[in-house]
From Swiss-Prot:
Pathway: Carbohydrate biosynthesis; gluconeogenesis; Carbohydrate degradation; glycolysis; D-glyceraldehyde 3-phosphate from glycerone phosphate: step 1/1. The keyword Ion transport does not apply. The gene is tpiA. Belongs to the triosephosphate isomerase family. This is Triosephosphate isomerase. The active site is at residues 85, 133. It catalyses: D-glyceraldehyde 3-phosphate = dihydroxyacetone phosphate. Keywords: Cytoplasm, Gluconeogenesis, Glycolysis, Isomerase.
């Protein structure tokens, strides 16, 4: 089970969260990664935690002011990237171009989508993984696996029909170990979460609670 913690732009200490994630991953054997702001990738990667970018742009080296170059993210220590999060949506051509950019930089990729139909379309672009996140549940503490489990099973089925090799994750409202188990029972191979860890008073305790049912 893969746990990817998206720090978004929350006012947390990214190194503190990353250190906690690295320790919990080492202690539990569960794969835990952290996706910080682009400027913090290097500092987070130095903790030893698996580090992801929140986004890379569909560009190569050149005149692209304000873009996030995939190669720069990789050089800073990222090993993967999210794409098309509901808070940073992309046009289809830009998703495809960003996947190409990530491939050039040898970054693992997860394309986010809102529902099973979009998951099928995302899987057709051949990322390493897709993640279904209903935007109305993001940050609510109500997990999609409980609010509407058919979204998760539908996403798993939609991806499998198009690309049997793609991993399917779910997100939105994930915050407890019970949520993680529910996602796994519905066929997801991992979860995305953010506020449940990034806004926690004790990120390590939050992560320990999250992975405890897997031990």
């Amino acid at each position: 089970m893969f746990v990817l913690v998206n720090l978004k732009a929350y006012p947390c200490d990214p190194v503190e969260v990353a250190t906690a994630a690295a320790d919990v991953s080492d202690d539990s054997g569960v794969r835990v990664a952290v996706a910080p702001q682009a400027a913090q990738i290097s500092a987070v990667a130095e903790t030893g935690v698996e580090t992801w970018a929140q986004h890379v742009s569909a560009v190569e080296h050149g005149s692209h002011t304000g873009s996030t170059l995939a190669e720069a993210a990789a050089d800073a220590g990222a090993v993967g990237t999210l794409l098309n999060h509901s808070e940073n949506r992309l046009k289809l051509a830009d998703i495809d171009g960003a996947l190409d950019a990530a491939d050039r930089a040898d970054l693992e990729t997860i394309v986010c989508a809102n529902n099973p139909a979009q998951i099928g379309a995302a899987a057709a672009l051949d990322p390493d993984g897709v993640a279904v996140e209903p935007p109305e549940l993001i940050g609510t503490g109500t997990p999609v696996s409980k609010a509407d489990p058919d979204i998760v099973t539908g996403a798993v089925d939609a991806a499998a029909r198009v690309n049997g090799d793609v991993d399917v994750l779910c997100g939105a409202g994930i915050s407890t170990g019970e949520d993680l188990v529910s996602a796994s029972d519905l066929g997801a191979s991992g979860v995305l979460l953010a506020s449940g860890v990034a806004k926690a008073d004790d990120p390590r305790a939050a992560l320990e609670d999250l992975v405890e049912p897997l031990l």
